[in-house]
């Protein structure tokens, strides 16, 4: 079973840049989208309910901003929107569903778009408040006996292997010491960073690149798009792939996939 996460940086723009063709090449059973930036009724004809997919959208209230979605080849059931703590998810940042693998066994996935704090101190404060709320949410998912995955743009590079220019970004949002510590705590509780487990101790594979300079062409990026698995998912983990070419073509993020036995 292949599960893919992709921050598309605006689905309408990605569709014009070859999203459909790259999706066919990747051929996931489930795709988790972030930064959709559109309501279904704003998409080109046929894309609100694309053929051969079961689709749930979770757009932001603010037009053209954030938003998540889950597409699956087999029917899925929506389990929740948001962090399930009584606070409205007006920015459409979390969508959680349950679907089945090809053998008919249940698998749970959450498409997550953690806020960025890079634009201002206020946005960083908002990000950190969101992180505090996310930790207990993630712990609840981790305990499930059903294979469960959190996939998405988490806007944090965990270690120096996850960021090309690590030394010069020590004080930048996304690589702050307390953000990295927070991420490490998630892993310490029992979440598996499946891409890192597959890549071992190599640098990257990066999943986001700045548009400045030659960062994209020279693969000088950040690894901030993750697929985290609980213990049940970790036992079934087979392999991981970062689709750099698709990222360069359609978005500033690469799609990232994992395969489960």
Regions found by a protein language model. Give the residues of each.
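Conserved beta strand-loop-helix elements of the APE1-like EEP
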Residues: 63-79, 202-203, 212-236
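Surface-exposed cleft-lining segments at the edges of enzyme active sites
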Residues: 84-85, 114-131, 167-171
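Active-site beta-strand/loop signature of hydrolases that rely on acidic residues for catalysis
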Residues: 6-7, 23-43, 109, 138-160, ...
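Active-site-proximal beta-strand elements of phosphoester/diester hydrolases
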Residues: 1-9, 106-121, 151
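Metal-dependent phosphoesterases centered on the DNase I-like endonuclease/exonuclease/phosphatase
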Residues: 51-54, 130-224
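Active-site beta-strand termini and strand-to-loop segments that position acidic
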Residues: 73, 97-104, 219, 230-231, ...
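Structured beta-strand-rich core segments of catalytic domains in phosphoester-bond hydrolases
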Residues: 37-117
